[in-house]
């Protein structure tokens, strides 16, 4: 609703319509992307990342399950930590990727690509039922349960501090690739320090029914820093400059991690 009111242009991504860019006055795509990306690099930008696939993973064998479906190791990931994972097909070609967070001893939250969420869940369920039925693991799709606002840029930490005044956002207390619980107006939320732009970034997850309120609160907190909403086109630019891949855009089903110069994420010990 907020995106429509602010005249966002939309594009189809998977089963969703995502804000493509936010033109001001008579801006075209190129002009809007240059403005949005400069704001994200110089001060602060905000992206609606709600459409990323989210799979709740629970069970005593959850760590072992992740160890089997991703190319890298997962058994030693600490509670409250996040890790990027790459998923391959049986033929060794890149299938999907995303960041998974360890919420508890036997509890993880996996994110997938927007377009791949349903297929990834289906594949994981298939593995559990046919390949590894002995594993104690339960999967639940929670993509539409949570709204996600991603705030990035040099001033993102200052904006988060305004939203969560009682929380310590220092690098020691809240390092990169970690997660903490928080509250906004007594509503529980999850805060992840994750970056898809190369800039300092935080993602806030909250129940979907509070998504618009969260977005408006972030915009209000970021006003003094001229926080700028940006769409998928700017996201593609920022992540490409950093060297991050998007499965389905940089891959076509025939790409291996080595083709993508990502052999660093393939464990040699399992």
Q: What residue ranges belong to the model's regions?
A:
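Acidic, proline/glycine-enriched N-terminal capping motif
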Residues: 1-88, 93
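Conserved, structured C-terminal
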Residues: 1-12, 18-20, 28, 104-107, ...
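Short amphipathic beta-strand starts and helix->beta connectors
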Residues: 35-42, 87-97, 133-135, 183-191
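Conserved hydrophobic/aromatic beta-strand scaffold that supports enzyme active sites
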Residues: 46, 54, 86, 99, ...
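N-terminal glycine-rich flavin-associated loop
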Residues: 47-61, 101-109, 148-151
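Acidic active-site catalytic centers that drive phospho-/nucleotidyl reactions
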Residues: 48, 97, 203
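Well-ordered mid-protein domain cores that form the structural environment of catalytic cofactors
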Residues: 72-127
């Amino acid at each position: 609703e907020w995106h429509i009111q602010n005249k966002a242009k939309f594009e189809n991504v998977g089963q969703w319509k995502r804000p493509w860019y936010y033109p001001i006055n008579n801006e075209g795509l190129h002009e809007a992307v240059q403005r949005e990306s400069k704001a994200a690099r110089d001060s602060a930008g905000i992206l609606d990342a709600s459409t990323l696939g989210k799979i709740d993973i629970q069970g005593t064998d959850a760590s072992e399950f992740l160890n089997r479906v991703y190319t890298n190791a997962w058994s030693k990931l600490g509670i409250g930590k996040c890790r990027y994972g790459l998923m391959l097909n049986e033929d060794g070609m890149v299938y999907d990727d995303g960041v998974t967070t360890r919420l508890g001893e036997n509890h993880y939250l996996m994110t997938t690509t927007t377009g791949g969420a349903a297929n990834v869940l289906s594949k994981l369920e298939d593995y559990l039922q046919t390949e590894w039925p002995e594993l104690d693991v339960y999967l639940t799709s929670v993509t539409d349960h949570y709204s996600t606002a991603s705030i990035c840029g040099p001033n993102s930490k200052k904006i988060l501090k305004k939203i969560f005044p009682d929380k310590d956002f220092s690098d020691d207390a809240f390092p990169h690739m970690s997660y903490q619980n928080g509250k906004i107006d007594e509503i529980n939320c999850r805060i992840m320090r994750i970056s898809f732009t190369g800039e300092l970034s935080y993602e806030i997850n909250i129940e979907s029914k509070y998504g618009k309120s969260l977005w408006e609160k972030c915009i209000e907190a970021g006003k003094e820093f001229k926080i700028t909403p940006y769409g998928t086109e700017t996201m593609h630019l920022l992540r490409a400059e950093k060297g991050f891949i998007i499965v389905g855009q940089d891959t076509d089903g025939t790409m291996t991690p080595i083709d993508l110069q990502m052999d660093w994420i393939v464990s040699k010990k399992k």
